[in-house]
């Protein structure tokens, strides 16, 4: 009996954890770390930890509310039908309450423990993801990812503001890198999930304009992304080292973009999507490494 109860509790905890979209949350926190490390000045380690926890909670809040709102279309898509809400493991009301609570807590704690600017940016990122992307753009325009991608680009600015209590052109450049990365990343996924998106009536770029035009735009955005990724060298301590890392990773990114335009198959698009995740991690790892003095 006790074993059964424990298993049910564990299963419930895991389902609420899945509401947070943890894979996205890890990337969000990592890019926030990059913003903190590149910022001038210093921050007490405990406050830095609090800041990152708030960023994680804010990201999870947006993810949970997104799953609450999208529960109807999630049920129609193979990729999402087993999520906690459409599968019936978590009620829609519980998910919404969970998401709102996390969002309020994250912004409140950030404001009280860290500073108001970082808290305001965190609030804007949550609200942008929920209201601008999820509720307004996602089901209405093929530019949903292009504009909505701004929501996921805020974490480096939040990290920077947590340290400096300000917003600067340097943090905006980090924002811009993620903003330019988002379209080719998600379009590569949507090319392989066209039937899912069509079934759910989501006007992804490839559904509205076709796969061939989407592949061309992936290449265009990939080139723009790689060019944008060179800009952090303007303020990093190890600028030349960073440039070499960014150019190397960027050339591979463009190679994958050319591959999907050339081969036009599921495998090349899957490889592009997978590499895009590794690319962003490696790029921001390079930013972190080239911001610190090890010797």
From Swiss-Prot:
It is found in: Cell inner membrane. Keywords: Cell inner membrane, Cell membrane, Heme biosynthesis, Membrane, Transferase, Transmembrane, Transmembrane helix. GO terms for cellular component: plasma membrane. It is an enzyme of class 2 (transferase). One of its GO terms (molecular function) is protoheme IX farnesyltransferase activity. One of its GO terms (biological process) is heme O biosynthetic process. The keyword RNA-binding does not apply. The keyword Metal-binding does not apply. Pathway: Porphyrin-containing compound metabolism; heme O biosynthesis; heme O from protoheme: step 1/1. It is a multi-pass membrane protein. It catalyses: heme b + (2E,6E)-farnesyl diphosphate + H2O = Fe(II)-heme o + diphosphate. Its EC number is 2.5.1.141. The chain crosses the membrane at residues 24-44, 45-65, 94-114, 117-137, 144-164, 171-191, 216-236, 240-260, 272-292. PROSITE patterns: UBIA. Converts heme B (protoheme IX) to heme O by substitution of the vinyl group on carbon 2 of heme B porphyrin ring with a hydroxyethyl farnesyl side group. Carbon 2 of the heme B porphyrin ring is defined according to the Fischer nomenclature. Belongs to the UbiA prenyltransferase family. Protoheme IX farnesyltransferase subfamily. This is Protoheme IX farnesyltransferase.
